[in-house]
């Protein structure tokens, strides 16, 4: 069985995982992960990861909507291939990343994104002001 997790596992697992990449100034880590269901939250072997194209002017909610849209489109393609009998190799998660709980999120976190950064974190990232790491994604389409 597969789960669609709205976050990039293993880096952002658990709750509000389209928010936390913005809080940590990593909007390029906003994405979705298709993975096997396991007892540990969002820790199953990965089939595919989707990330949206980031564009100037995108805010946190734009990126969240784009993530759902691209994950849906890519899942359709994956499902069509599964129906035709294609088998995919799954990639075991090599690290635990961070498991975020609902209790971790406070309204002050969101105020920081809006008040301190004026919801322009994507703009800062695209301008090269934030630097940072780049996720190595598992992709099958």
How does the language model describe each region?
Residues 1-111:
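Donor/substrate-binding cores of folate-linked one-carbon enzymes
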């Amino acid at each position: 069985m597969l789960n669609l997790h709205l976050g990039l596992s293993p880096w952002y697992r658990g709750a509000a995982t389209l928010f936390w990449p913005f809080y940590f100034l990593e909007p390029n880590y906003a994405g979705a992960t298709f993975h096997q269901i396991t007892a540990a939250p969002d820790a199953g072997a990965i089939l595919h990861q989707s990330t949206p194209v980031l564009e100037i002017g995108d805010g946190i909610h734009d990126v969240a909507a784009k993530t759902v849209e691209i994950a849906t489109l890519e899942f359709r393609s994956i499902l069509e291939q599964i129906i035709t009998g294609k088998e995919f190799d799954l990639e075991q998660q090599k690290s635990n990343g961070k498991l975020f709980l609902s209790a971790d999120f406070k309204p002050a976190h969101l105020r920081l994104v809006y008040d301190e950064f004026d919801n322009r974190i994507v703009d800062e990232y695209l301008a090269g002001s934030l630097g940072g790491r780049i996720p190595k994604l598992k992709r099958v389409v």
